[in-house]
């Protein structure tokens, strides 16, 4: 997690995970959630919390990055950057074959690592339906923010703006 909007800002929290795929998904999601800015308000007699990213969108983004990354790129790793205005999930490699950003948004699927997808399906992390990216966009649109997918050099980046309490 960074103190501002750039990687040149102060690092507030940094973790390097070397566990199993499933434990890394869980640990990444927990670490991000601990560092997210949470808004609170009183509604009636109850306190209500507003999270800037839904749990489903976060988990799906992390799972996609780990399962669909290009493991042939030596020395590269999935990187998660939490800034004050957005979360960036950076996955090594460009999309495989003829997959484009637009095709990802509508759920076209090509599994770069089918064995990993099978394992994660058996562990109930994925459904193999190609609906992860459309679900992330739907979840975040429900909070009135628009995620972005972009390709930079040899990385696929999912950028999710942090929602504010009133959109």
Walk through the language-model features, giving the residues of each.
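Conserved beta-strand-loop-beta-strand hairpin that lines the nucleotide-binding pocket
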Residues: 1-26, 53-166
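Helix-hairpin-helix/helix-loop-helix acidic hairpins
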Residues: 4, 17-50
């Amino acid at each position: 997690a960074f103190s501002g909007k750039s990687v040149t800002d102060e690092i507030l929290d940094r973790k390097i995970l070397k566990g199993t795929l499933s434990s890394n998904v869980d640990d990444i999601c927990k670490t991000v959630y601990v560092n997210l800015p949470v808004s609170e308000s009183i509604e009636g007699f109850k306190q209500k919390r507003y999270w800037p990213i839904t749990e489903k969108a976060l988990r799906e983004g992390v799972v996609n990055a780990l399962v669909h990354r290009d493991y042939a790129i030596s020395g590269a790793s999935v990187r998660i950057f939490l800034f004050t205005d957005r979360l960036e999930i950076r996955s090594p490699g460009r999309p495989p074959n003829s997959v484009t950003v637009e095709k990802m948004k509508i759920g076209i699927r090509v599994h770069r690592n089918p064995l990993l997808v099978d394992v994660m399906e058996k562990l109930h992390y994925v459904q193999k339906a190609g609906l992860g990216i459309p679900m992330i966009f739907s979840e975040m649109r429900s909070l009135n923010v628009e995620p972005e997918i972009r390709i930079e050099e040899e990385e696929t980046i999912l950028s999710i703006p942090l929602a504010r309490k009133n959109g």
